[in-house]
Curated annotation (Swiss-Prot):
Transmembrane segments: none annotated. Keywords: DNA-binding, Metal-binding, Neurogenesis, Nucleus, Repeat, Repressor, Transcription, Transcription regulation, Zinc, Zinc-finger. This is Zinc finger protein 488. One of its GO terms (cellular component) is nucleus.
Amino acid sequence: MAAGTSTLLSLSGPADHMAEGKGAPLRPSVEKRWKLMEPKQTQAGMFKKMSLVDSDTAAGKGSQDEAYTELSLPTAPNKPRLDRPRACKAYTEQRHNTFTELSCLQERPGDIQAQTRKLENPEGQLGPQQLPSSFLRASGDGTVCSAWPGAPRSEQKSAFSKPAKRPAEKPKRSPMLLAGGSAEGSWELSGLITTVDIPYWAHLSTFKFMGDFWKLHTLSQNILLCNAFQGAPTPWLEHTQVQAPTSSAPSSTASRALLPPTLSSLGLSTQNWCAKCNLAFRLTADLVFHMRSHHKREHVGPDPHSKKRREEVLTCPVCHEYFRERHHLSRHMASHS
């Protein structure tokens, strides 16, 4: 029995022993056992407190659910509803205002187009003073922009943009081309290329025409010079008649025979030509070969008349110089021309 009572005392707390009023101090073994058993008791108390808190929160949730159910209950139409948050009402009003603003913005471009159609002049173009002030928009950096009705809304033309380029004016006709030119003018190349495509075409054509004119002029001068060579026998004959008026008839006929023939268009030299067959040669050696092969030297007879006649034939009618060969005389006559 004594052992059973000791175990019961050890299981009971110190408060029970103090309540009995015995006032006897506890033994150290019993006190150690009580200290070991104390955490279990405190944990049990904490579990009780947690259960009480959970029950309180459940009760609070129930009250909130009841409040929400009361708010969701339908009410009579004449009877005002319960206090609802005013934020929802303000949000719906704001959405309604934004929708109305968007509808106004969608209707506004049509009105602007109607105004522009009314302001158009009979030719279908807007004058610079007829543009309404609503078309002028000021941007943030101070530049003024104009919204044209024909262009889309995204494109805006600046009021300070560069003016359109004027079509190029036709250049004045040259006085050289006014005399014999067509109605279209020399600067229009069969309707394909105009002066706008090729600048300075009129000046170029005038320069080319003048160049061709001077070429023709020099060519005509060259032709006249060649004609002077071709028609040279008559002036040379007159010159011989003036210089030697006292010469006899055989000398005049001989000088006429020694004059150079008509030159070809190749411009061969007048010194290398044959007086007998009227052939011209480029080189003097060719003329010598021709004279030796075709025109052999004639043996002069003892007749003095024939010798005198030969001397008269081979004498220069200008300076009266005598030559042994006929081609020498012809070369000398070329120096007098």
